[in-house]
Amino acid sequence: MKHRCFEPYDALTVGEAMFVKEEILPQFIGDQGYFSTIFAFEPCHAYRKGKNYMDYDWPQPFDDWKKETFHNQKIIEKAGFEANIIENHDQPRGASLFIPEEDYGFYSLSALAMIMLCQRGLPFLYQGQEIGMSNRRWEYAEFNDLETINQYHIAREAGMSEEQALKIASHHSRDNARTPMQWNHDENAGFSTEKPWMPVNENYKIVNVKDEEKEYGSILNFYKRLIAFRKSGEYNEILTYGDFKPMYEEEYHIFAYSRSYGDQKLVLICNFSSEEKSVELLEDYESVVFVNYEQTTVIGNRLQMKPYECVVYEKR
């Protein structure tokens, strides 16, 4: 199929393939693979500790997420490029899965965006991710997804109360990613004048495209700046083709890695937590090239990081 359908048109194909072993990755991606790339599901699924919702962690455990990301980056590098994601139509919203509810906001959302878009690979954004769409609060009768309904009953049969089962189902339901896009303040978030197939998230008057387009400090406009940074002439090649190397692997709630290409090097350091952190800088860096706060603070050789601060340094 690849040779007859895709190659004549130089088509980019993306496969849904999970837990592909390192030794057979070249069969799936790259010049000789079935597809151009496959989605990087493993880091997003690090919270799944069993077969049922009630076995899953919530929110996503930081160490498991970081470990899976670093592992994926290591094994994929020789085979080709993976399609990096934070969320998709079969998962809860990344803004809720990766970020504790009390920490939801611009800095946590922008840190999550930087961690993903600066990795090696092909970044995919899912509709609504760019404005920070999150999970909604559900009543049992509102669920549309059969998996969610089944998981609710599995939790009840295991002895959980209605409230507990509903909470678990609400966290993990795929319906969270399938609510209508939030365009503006109008009825049904501007998606349709007719009743949509499922309820709109109640936060649509706060989280919507129209408001965020007008606000420079919105997560939507941050995504635009971050994408422009990745595509810029100065950094496009290193962020596309550069080697990926994990850093600060033992530092809890510090997500860091370097990208190297020729004589150019970038280092991303992120404090993915609600507490301030002090991080030792392992090298002298020439400049800060991207950050989600207005400024960074360095005292001696230590970076004093604010909650959810994420910074990209350059070293030549």
Set out the residue ranges of the language-model regions.
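Active-site and adjacent substrate-binding regions of carbohydrate-active enzymes
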Residues: 1-286, 291-316
